[in-house]
Amino acid sequence: MKYTEQKIFTQEQVQKLFLSVNWISGNYPERLYKALMHSSTVLTVWDDEKLVGITRVLDDTEMLARVHYVIVHPDYQGKGIAGQMIEYIKEKYKNFLYIEGMPEDKKNVPFYVKHGFSVMENGAAIQICNLDKN
């Protein structure tokens, strides 16, 4: 497996990975690709020419880095890839005051806790979803 921050992926490769885990973002390949290309950090994992994992981080250059998602193709899950991506991100952002995770599903919270994140006692993720407006 090769881990890299180089944004060498294609729109089609990203779409295929997102759809493999049933993420609705995969239905918007052009927007997804643009978002990734303008993200602070995109860590990808490759098995030869196949994109098998991706982590996206948005940061403010000093204080806060937010892990927006950690995605691993179903055929590669359970092999420690997601954990290695998170550890890489933790090392890269170790001098920031905060590294936050945004698990899309509560079932993923234990994964983040296992890697040193804490659940915010009085906090909750919130969002506005504009999917129906597009």
Where on the chain are the PLM-derived regions?
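Conserved acetyl-CoA-binding loop-helix of GNAT-fold acetyltransferases
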Residues: V72, G78-E91
